[in-house]
């Protein structure tokens, strides 16, 4: 049996800056609960961003230590405009867990 090889890094045509990776914080009732109890923060992120990109961006922009990043790709919803049916855009969400000594104070 051969050993399992780690995945090859994905080559992107564009390199994203930290302010391009984190699009906006997701401030919801559930998000505020996570921030106060579990020290986890949610952000809407660029669709091409990886977990490592998100970790580096949060650490660079907020001067905190990130323990874990979880990502989700959310599907857009069907919406109706007059007599036509369309869809909202798909988007990507990241939930970032911080070290217990660090906080992001805008939540």
Curated annotation (Swiss-Prot):
The protein, known as:
Large ribosomal subunit protein uL23
Assembly information from the UniProt record: Part of the 50S ribosomal subunit. Contacts protein L29, and trigger factor when it is bound to the ribosome.
Function of the molecule = One of the early assembly proteins it binds 23S rRNA. One of the proteins that surrounds the polypeptide exit tunnel on the outside of the ribosome. Forms the main docking site for trigger factor binding to the ribosome.
One Gene Ontology biological process: translation
The lineage is: Bacteria, Pseudomonadati, Planctomycetota, Planctomycetia, Pirellulales
Species for this entry: Rhodopirellula baltica (strain DSM 10527 / NCIMB 13988 / SH1)
Family from the record = Belongs to the universal ribosomal protein uL23 family.
HAMAP family (UniProt xref): Ribosomal_uL23_B
GO MF terms, alphabetically ordered: rRNA binding; structural constituent of ribosome
**InterPro entries tied to this protein:** Nucleotide-bd_a/b_plait_sf (IPR012677), Ribosomal_uL23-like (IPR013025), Ribosomal_uL23/eL15/eS24_sf (IPR012678)
Gene Ontology terms, cellular component aspect? cytosolic large ribosomal subunit
Cross-referenced Pfam families: Ribosomal_L23
């Amino acid at each position: 049996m051969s050993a399992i090889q780690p995945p090859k890094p994905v080559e992107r045509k564009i390199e994203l800056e930290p302010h391009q990776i984190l699009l906006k914080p997701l401030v919801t009732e559930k998000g505020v609960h996570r921030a106060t109890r579990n020290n986890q923060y949610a952000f809407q992120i660029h669709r091409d961003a990886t977990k490592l990109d998100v970790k580096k961006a949060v650490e660079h922009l907020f001067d905190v230590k990130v323990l874990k990043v979880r990502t989700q790709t959310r599907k857009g919803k069907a919406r109706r405009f007059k007599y036509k049916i369309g869809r909202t855009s798909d988007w990507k969400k990241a939930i970032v867990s911080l070290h217990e000594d660090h906080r992001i104070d805008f939540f």
